[in-house]
Amino acid sequence: MHLRIHARRSPPRRPAWTLGIWFLFWGCIVSSVWSSSNVASSSSTSSSPGSHSQHEHHFHGSKHHSVPISIYRSPVSLRGGHAGATYIFGKSGGLILYTWPANDRPSTRSDRLAVGFSTTVKDGILVRIDSAPGLGDFLQLHIEQGKIGVVFNIGTVDISIKEERTPVNDGKYHVVRFTRNGGNATLQVDNWPVNEHYPTGRQLTIFNTQAQIAIGGKDKGRLFQGQLSGLYYDGLKVLNMAAENNPNIKINGSVRLVGEVPSILGTTQTTSMPPEMSTTVMETTTTMATTTTRKNRSTASIQPTSDDLVSSAECSSDDEDFVECEPSTGGELVIPLLVEDPLATPPIATRAPSITLPPTFRPLLTIIETTKDSLSMTSEAGLPCLSDQGSDGCDDDGLVISGYGSGETFDSNLPPTDDEDFYTTFSLVTDKSLSTSIFEGGYKAHAPKWESKDFRPNKVSETSRTTTTSLSPELIRFTASSSSGMVPKLPAGKMNNRDLKPQPDIVLLPLPTAYELDSTKLKSPLITSPMFRNVPTANPTEPGIRRVPGASEVIRESSSTTGMVVGIVAAAALCILILLYAMYKYRNRDEGSYQVDETRNYISNSAQSNGTLMKEKQQSSKSGHKKQKNKDREYYV
């Protein structure tokens, strides 16, 4: 008796689980791409403009910091809708501190910094940008021995660039522009020649994980005293943000905002400019002015024992004293930058700020200050007409202040102001009463050719109007004669900020971007800010090789790192699922079906047990089942 078991393998079922694995594989790829695109799109809304960056590393001691990929930001963030804010730093020092959120700290390969300032101090820090603690990267704009300079470190050694030609602590308003691209840098003050620096050797290029911007130098013990206006750094207008009470900004010490629009001027009609006509810096220069001869007016000279220089009045006493003055002889020159410590100020300021000068500074100047009996002069003088308020009572001449430190002028809008509202002004903008009998047909302001068509000229009253202008040094040195038979007196630099005050609506022309006026085709990848005009951009190339200026690159470290981690985790999880599914299908695969055939064969006689007969039986069995040898297997029991 033997059992016959037929083993038949069923057809393979591979296509079912193979399709499942393929489905999971493509799902893994699609999910990874989707997660990466979501992270990139969410990061691009808050990152700054930049171009492609290479994968670079900084080595600070034993720490190794990897730099993620760069994120693009719209160039629109470089523009604003109004002029830059202005802050006065008193003699006791102050600090404006902006701190980036912990998850939004940028790393940059190139930087742009610009600010307007005026001061008389010989040493002080204007702006300093520091990286996160432990990294040591920084960028600092400072005045040393009266000269402006920048020092920065991005991982190797301190690199410095300085304007050696002329001191900038002369009390005049200056605009400084700094660009960095890798280790190369440029520095320009006003329209002076550009200083360039190309360090030798291999330099690291990334300013890692920027954490805070400190303005004023109080945290480093090098106090800045004077005025700062329209600070711009890589798309951030920090002073504007401070004026808007940004939660990431803290203000300490003797710091005062000027240029606010008070509630009493809430009904004043102003003009709004498009973003293309906005800028962040307002520049003033020492100017000439005519004054109305009045009774009870006198001049007061600076006492040699005092270091304070009062700038914006016609009498030496405070306006609250109501002290009448004797007539002045005219011809006085006043330095336009003067501030004071703003500790106790009245609700409506009646006095301009003053600044403490060095003990060795004894200017032989006379100062004139306005008392309240001079307020009638404002109504007589009038104000420049707004371009959108019609042309009644106005002529064709209008004078405004240039946005660059070279004395350029152009037409703009200047809303009417109240003589009492000092805090609506930028404290260093000088206002003058220009008689049309003297300046008839003259001093017509001209804007640069590429931007002159954006403005309509203001008009001045036939009698006289209070206007603002910046004149050449030759005109500043002019002194009026006291003879009654000559033209009216023109005392130089009368600082009366209360008669006419520039408003935040005064908008200066920005620099042309990479799009030219007559064409919308992009000529170069250069991204400019309103204060960078014709400033060469230093590129991180080999020494002596200079390329076309590149765009600022800002890398959002936290968002890109998060996206990378999410993508890796998702891919790893999907791969593990695929592996588990494959193992499950392998262990539970179909081994085939088996059929057992039981038959009984009885031995009829004992002779069949002989070996010969057994062989014949086996041969006959093989021949009988020859067709089924591949299907059936016989097992003898």
From Swiss-Prot:
Polar residues: compositionally biased ranges: 298-310
Region Disordered: start-end pairs: 43-65, 289-310, 605-637
Positions of glycan attachment: 184, 252, 296, 312
Binding-site residues for Ca(2+), renumbered to this chain: 137, 154, 206, 208
Any Pfam family the entry gives: Laminin_G_2
Residues on Extracellular side: 36-562
Membrane topology: Single-pass type I membrane protein
Phosphoprotein keyword on record: no
Topology Cytoplasmic: residue spans: 584-637
Residue ranges of the TM segments: 563-583
Subcellular compartments: Presynaptic cell membrane
Biased composition (Low complexity): 43-52
Residues annotated as signal peptide: 1-35
Tissue and organ distribution: Expressed in the blood vessel walls (at protein level).
Post-translational modification as stated in the protein's UniProt record: Processed by alpha-secretase leading to the formation of an extracellular soluble protein as well as a C-terminal membrane-embedded fragment (CTF). Proteolysis of these CTFs by gamma-secretase releases intracellular domains (ICDs) and extracellular peptides.
Sequence ranges assigned to domain Laminin G-like in this UniProt record: 85-255
InterPro entries in alphabetical order: ConA-like_dom_sf, Laminin_G, Neurexin-like, Neurexin-related_CASP, Syndecan/Neurexin_dom
GO biological process, one term: signal transduction
Function: Neuronal cell surface protein that may be involved in cell recognition and cell adhesion. May mediate intracellular signaling. Functions as part of a trans-synaptic complex by binding to cerebellins and postsynaptic GRID1. This interaction helps regulate the activity of NMDA and AMPA receptors at hippocampal synapses without affecting synapse formation. NRXN3B-CBLN2-GRID1 complex transduce presynaptic signals into postsynaptic AMPAR response.
Quaternary structure (record): Weakly interacts with CBLN1 and CBLN2. Very weak binding, if any, to CBLN4. Specific isoforms bind neuroligins NLGN1, NLGN2 and NLGN3. Interacts with CLSTN3.
Name used for this protein in its record: Neurexin-3-beta
Organism field: Homo sapiens
Protein encoded by which gene: NRXN3
